[in-house]
């Protein structure tokens, strides 16, 4: 939490994690610098971890998506909730159709509930968000995009 806010400028603050992966992959596949391409592909093959812990026997011990759910689901929920104001029930129905064959209904429900809980209970982190560009049509900047109390309770939404 602190490291994200101490950087003073959030260069990727409105770029979804799933899009970052595609951008890195695109650059890795199109650069003429073979060494850079290898490094970028290695980065893409490494699971995202919240801790800078060394791997134990070559295995990362803590993976973010194991804790919070797949980024593609979170980005989907966030986009349609903020951009179009869709309620939780509609997000669930849309996600079931969109991710049919990828995630079962129970998995989507589990991570949708987790998303709502985390989204509303972690608003205090946005209050001290550093400056950064708005890249897409959805952003969570407290200065112009999403105005919401820092102490919002998730119970009303879950």
Residue spans of the language-model regions?
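ATP/NTP-dependent adenylation/nucleotidyl-transfer catalytic domains that generate, transfer
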Residues: 1-158
């Amino acid at each position: 939490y602190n490291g994200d806010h101490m950087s003073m400028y959030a260069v990727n603050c409105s770029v979804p994690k799933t899009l970052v992966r595609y951008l890195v992959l695109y650059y890795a596949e199109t650069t003429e610098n073979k060494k850079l391409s290898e490094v970028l592909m290695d980065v893409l093959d490494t699971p995202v971890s919240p801790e800078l812990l060394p791997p134990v026997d070559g295995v990362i011990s803590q993976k973010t998506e194991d804790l919070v759910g797949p980024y593609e689901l979170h980005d989907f929920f966030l986009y349609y909730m903020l951009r179009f104001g869709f309620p939780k029930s509609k997000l669930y129905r849309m996600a079931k159709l969109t991710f049919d064959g990828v995630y079962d209904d129970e998995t989507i429900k589990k991570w949708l509930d987790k998303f709502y809980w985390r989204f509303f209970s972690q608003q205090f982190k946005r209050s001290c968000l550093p400056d950064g560009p708005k890249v897409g049509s959805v952003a969570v900047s407290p200065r112009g995009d999403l105005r919401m109390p820092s102490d919002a309770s998730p119970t009303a939404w879950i």
